[in-house]
């Protein structure tokens, strides 16, 4: 088989495919003489050698329910495939061998509890009996073994394509036959029969057509791309990726089968089905951090295969491994395999996938450089959608995003509503999750609509947002990619090597930089908006340590980016925005400056609010109570203040020297303490407000109460807190978070300032640009060309895997992909350094506590004296404090005298014995 470069213009794909078929040196099928529609035959007898998931098959029942799924295996991680006699006719078809039955039902059943695989109606053992352990797919050793070259097969010589390793590999028979006949029949390309692998040995900026690189969708098939959906991945588990990928595929189905959209309906009528204008790109940030079970999931749908990646090509390191395939299979989060069924309107449509697996971990900005500068340059999409692995797009969410751009030619970027994954409310039991859920909700109800009204949304979350591809070309992407550490040497002073710590922090919130640069782009008038109907569900941190680490990056990045946008606001005048838009952008800039100012002083404002409000309790609410009651609440308030100050100081001690994961108990205790103090503050505030309102009802003087210095501000604050939140939530028909999450938020809110802000600012130096090595890539084989003659181009000898071997390997892949998922409980034990820092922190905390207690005790030695005048109180306080200082001074004198006595004795002793010293 010839492996020439796919260097061609749009429209040449069919001619090239015809050439390739004429040059084939081997047959794809096991039986090359098989007539169309005839079942495959296995020359060796026994089980047939291929699956026939073909809708033309008479046993392919159309009446089956949509989205039949493969049942999960047993909890032990083993799986066995058996026939279902009550559903599947006993035929010589090979469907059962691959887990797909002729009538559309899946045959993936529970393993036998006896330890032996159950027998099949044919009398033999199940071919899907898995001998792999439950930890196999997570094992780096097992994955490394699967990357080795096959031990048997035909050896073929492959010529590199302009020096590049670009090879088409046959997909498993079951995957190939899962495609509906209306898509596969008449398709003369290898789109559904082969997966294309490219070992990209270049920087993403050099992945161009001129350099010999190409993509099947654009160069071979000549298709134009309307929608490029990018899923960025780091180390999420297979269930999180399945949530995202399956949600995306459901959205693509809804777009392609939408009857309300004239654009997509007209495209289908013109012979260009909607799925041919949509590409899904999965970009993985390194082999090392990648969960290997995720690769099994991708192999199940056909877009990845073990044993095909190459670490080097002629001595050049592979930078990224690209896999291309169009699949109609999916795995849902159950996990279960989703396959099409004949004439079922709810079937998934084929999805063009490009899987980009970077060899080394080089961070998210670099992943986006592969998206925009490499893949996007070839595909030239109208719209790019960015989704983080773990974010589940809601029903028709991608359509609503696309619709917003389609109806507004000046729209450069948009985002949907991101809400926390609460699992039907079960996760709201965790107050941290509930508080974050409330934050997300109110941001989507108050903040995003406000910014969208101005035309500038300060941040389009990278977890779920979209950009017009041509809008971000030029300066927006150039500024954005200055944060890519792989460009640091090339950019020099403009890159990371030339940045100060403040600028580096700015790129922790890189999406904010892209938003500002897009709106301020010279000569254009791009706007940003919020699309309320487009919803995405994401998981949020459930532990204190994880939340603190996440918010460090968010807070430091957003703070630096906010300063950047305000300082460079004048660049907005170079844009082509109208006078009205500029006026509103000025108002928004003023608003952002005020918000930034308040966030800067949030620490002091919270302490002053707490200390002043709780003093109203004895001064205003209990002023007519007994002396004993006043004394009790005086000391309660004093204790509350001391505890507040101590735990606030403790946050600085922790933040300056400890990892959150190394001090989990202390941070949890801090959240609890600040939560209790926050409840006390709310209790006093509500009591004071209620008392004022009761007095108003008696006196009838409403205006005096509202503008009273003591209670007026409290009433206004509570109205803003409770009233505006509630009214806005009801207005948007989404009020339930006020019931399920608001109380928890009020408890956690002080910790957001006193813990998260303190930790973030104390770790401003930590920009986390370091990357991990990718030693796992050493398991991959290399490619070196050989030349028989100096005049001939170099070739590579490669063992071609037989189709039976591919299918046999696929069995184990599916069993691992749909096995029951057990989250890995990694108990992170504190390191020796953590233990040392913990001892230091607790010692310093005890030191601060004892010194602070002594200071407070002396300053408040009189306690509360309500029966004395201020002058008498001051005299008593001065007298007692003078006594303390006299004690301190005499003690100091005594210690010094004692030292002097010792010094004197030593002097006398040494000088008196000088004459008797031996020399």
Swiss-Prot record:
Induction remark: Expression is slightly lower in the yeast form than in the mycelium and shows a maximal expression in the log phase at about 14-18 h of incubation.
Enzyme class: transferase
Residues with attached carbohydrate: 187, 556
Chief localisation class: membrane
GO biological process: cell wall organization; chitin biosynthetic process
Protein name: Chitin synthase 1
Cystine bridges: none
Region span, Disordered: 1-69, 109-134
InterPro entries, per the entry: Chitin_synth (IPR004835), Chitin_synth_fun (IPR004834), Chitin_synth_N (IPR013616), Nucleotide-diphossugar_trans (IPR029044)
Pfam families attached to this UniProt entry: Chitin_synth_1 (PF01644), Chitin_synth_1N (PF08407)
Location within or outside the cell: Cell membrane; Cytoplasmic vesicle membrane
Membrane topology: Multi-pass membrane protein
Biased composition (Low complexity): 11-30
Coiled coil: none
EC annotation from Swiss-Prot or TrEMBL: 2.4.1.16
UniProt GO MF annotations: chitin synthase activity
Gene label: CHS1
Residues annotated as transmembrane: 594-614, 630-650, 668-688, 713-733, 742-762, 843-863, 887-919
Reaction equation(s) it catalyzes: [(1->4)-N-acetyl-beta-D-glucosaminyl](n) + UDP-N-acetyl-alpha-D-glucosamine = [(1->4)-N-acetyl-beta-D-glucosaminyl](n+1) + UDP + H(+)
The organism's place on the tree of life at top rank: Eukaryota
Record's keyword terms, sorted: Cell membrane, Cell wall biogenesis/degradation, Cytoplasmic vesicle, Glycoprotein, Glycosyltransferase, Membrane, Transferase, Transmembrane, Transmembrane helix
Keyword DNA-binding: no
Function: Polymerizes chitin, a structural polymer of the cell wall and septum, by transferring the sugar moiety of UDP-GlcNAc to the non-reducing end of the growing chitin polymer.
Family to which the UniProt record says this protein belongs: Belongs to the chitin synthase family. Class III subfamily.
GO cellular component annotations of the record: cell periphery; cell septum; cytoplasmic vesicle membrane; plasma membrane
């Amino acid at each position: 088989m010839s492996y020439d470069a796919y260097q061609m213009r749009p429209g040449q794909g069919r001619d090239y495919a015809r050439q390739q078929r004429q040059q084939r040196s081997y047959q794809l099928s096991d039986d090359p003489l098989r007539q169309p529609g005839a079942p495959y035959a296995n020359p060796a007898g026994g089980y047939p050698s291929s699956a026939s998931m073909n809708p033309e098959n008479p046993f392919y029942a159309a009446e089956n329910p949509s989205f039949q799924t493969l049942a999960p295996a047993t909890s032990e991680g083993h799986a066995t495939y058996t026939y279902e006699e009550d559903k599947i006719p006993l035929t010589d078809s090979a469907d059962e061998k691959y887990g797909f039955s002729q009538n559309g039902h899946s045959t993936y059943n529970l393993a036998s509890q006896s330890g032996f695989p159950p027998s099949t109606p044919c009398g033999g053992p199940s071919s899907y009996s898995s001998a792999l352990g439950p930890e196999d797919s997570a094992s780096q050793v097992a994955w490394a073994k699967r990357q080795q070259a096959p031990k048997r097969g035909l050896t073929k010589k492959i010529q590199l394509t302009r020096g590049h390793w670009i090879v088409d590999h046959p997909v498993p028979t079951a995957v190939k036959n899962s495609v509906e006949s209306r898509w596969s029949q008449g398709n003369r390309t290898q789109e559904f029969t082969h997966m294309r692998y490219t070992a990209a040995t270049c920087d993403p900026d050099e992945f161009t057509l001129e350099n010999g690189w190409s993509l099947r969708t654009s160069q071979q098939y000549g298709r134009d791309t309307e929608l490029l959906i990018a899923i960025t991945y780091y180390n999420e588990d297979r269930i999180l990726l399945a949530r995202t990928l399956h949600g995306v595929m459901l959205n693509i189905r809804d777009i392609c089968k939408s009857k309300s959209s004239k654009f997509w309906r007209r495209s289908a009528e013109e012979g260009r089905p909607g799925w041919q204008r949509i590409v899904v790109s999965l970009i993985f940030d390194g082999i090392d951090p990648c969960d290997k079970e995720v690769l099994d999931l991708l192999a199940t749908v056909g877009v990845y295969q073990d044993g095909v990646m190459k670490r080097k090509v002629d001595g050049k390191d592979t930078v990224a491994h690209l896999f291309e395939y169009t699949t109609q299979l999916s795995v849902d989060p159950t996990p279960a395999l989703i396959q099409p069924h004949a004439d079922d309107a709810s079937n998934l449509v084929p999805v063009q996938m490009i899987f980009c697996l970077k060899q080394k971990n080089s961070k998210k900005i670099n992943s986006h450089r592969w998206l925009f500068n490499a893949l996007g340059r070839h595909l030239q999409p109208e719209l790019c959608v960015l989704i983080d692995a773990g974010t589940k797009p809601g029903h028709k969410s991608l359509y609503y995003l696309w619709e917003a751009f389609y109806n507004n030619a000046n729209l450069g970027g948009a985002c949907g509503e991101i809400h926390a994954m609460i699992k039907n409310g079960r996760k709201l039991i965790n107050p941290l999750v509930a508080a974050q859920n409330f934050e997300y909700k109110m941001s989507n109800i108050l903040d995003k609509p406000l910014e969208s009204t101005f035309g500038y949304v300060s941040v389009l979350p990278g977890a779920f947002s979209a950009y017009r591809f041509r809008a971000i070309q030029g300066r927006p992407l150039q500024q954005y990619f200055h944060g890519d550490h792989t460009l640091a040497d090339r950019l020099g002073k403009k890159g990371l090597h030339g940045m100060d710590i403040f600028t580096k922090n700015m790129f922790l919130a890189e999406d904010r930089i892209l938003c500002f640069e897009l709106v301020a782009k010279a000569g254009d008038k791009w706007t940003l908006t919020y699309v309320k109907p487009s919803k995405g569900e994401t998981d949020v941190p459930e532990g204190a340590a994880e939340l603190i680490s996440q918010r460090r990056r968010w807070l430091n990045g957003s703070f630096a980016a906010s300063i950047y946008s305000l300082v460079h606001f004048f660049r907005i005048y170079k844009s082509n925005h109208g006078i009205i838009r500029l006026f509103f952008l000025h108002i928004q800039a003023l608003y952002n400056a005020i918000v930034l100012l308040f966030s800067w002083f949030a620490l002091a404002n919270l302490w002053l609010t707490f200390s002043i409000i709780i003093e109203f309790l004895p001064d205003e609410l209990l002023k007519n109570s007994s002396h004993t009651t006043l004394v009790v609440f005086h000391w309660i308030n004093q204790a509350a203040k001391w505890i507040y100050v101590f735990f606030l100081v403790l946050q600085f001690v922790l933040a300056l020297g400890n990892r959150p994961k190394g001090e989990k108990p202390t941070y949890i205790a801090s959240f609890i303490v600040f939560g209790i103090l926050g409840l006390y503050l709310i209790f006093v505030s509500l009591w004071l407000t209620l008392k004022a309102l009761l007095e108003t009802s008696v006196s009838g003087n409403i205006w005096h109460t509202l503008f009273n210095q003591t209670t007026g501000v409290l009433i206004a604050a509570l109205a803003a807190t409770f009233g505006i939140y509630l009214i806005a939530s009801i207005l948007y028909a989404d009020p339930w978070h006020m019931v399920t999450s608001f109380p928890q938020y009020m408890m956690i809110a002080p910790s957001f300032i006193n813990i998260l802000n303190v930790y973030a600012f104390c770790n401003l130096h930590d920009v986390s640009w370091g990357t991990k090595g990718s030693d796992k890539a050493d398991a991959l084989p290399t490619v070196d060309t050989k030349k028989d003659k100096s005049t001939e181009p170099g070739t590579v000898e490669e063992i071609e895997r037989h189709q039976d071997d591919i299918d046999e390997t696929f069995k184990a892949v599916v069993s691992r992909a749909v096995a029951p998922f057990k989250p890995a409980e990694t108990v992170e034990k504190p390191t020796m350094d953590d233990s040392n820092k913990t001892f230091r922190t607790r010692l310093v905390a005890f030191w601060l506590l004892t010194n602070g207690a002594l200071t407070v005790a002396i300053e408040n030695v009189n306690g509360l004296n309500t029966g004395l005048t201020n002058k008498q109180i001051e005299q008593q306080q001065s007298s007692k404090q003078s006594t303390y200082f006299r004690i301190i001074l005499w003690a100091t004198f005594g210690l010094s005298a004692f030292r002097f006595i010792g010094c004197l004795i030593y002097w006398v002793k040494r000088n008196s014995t000088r004459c008797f010293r031996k020399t």
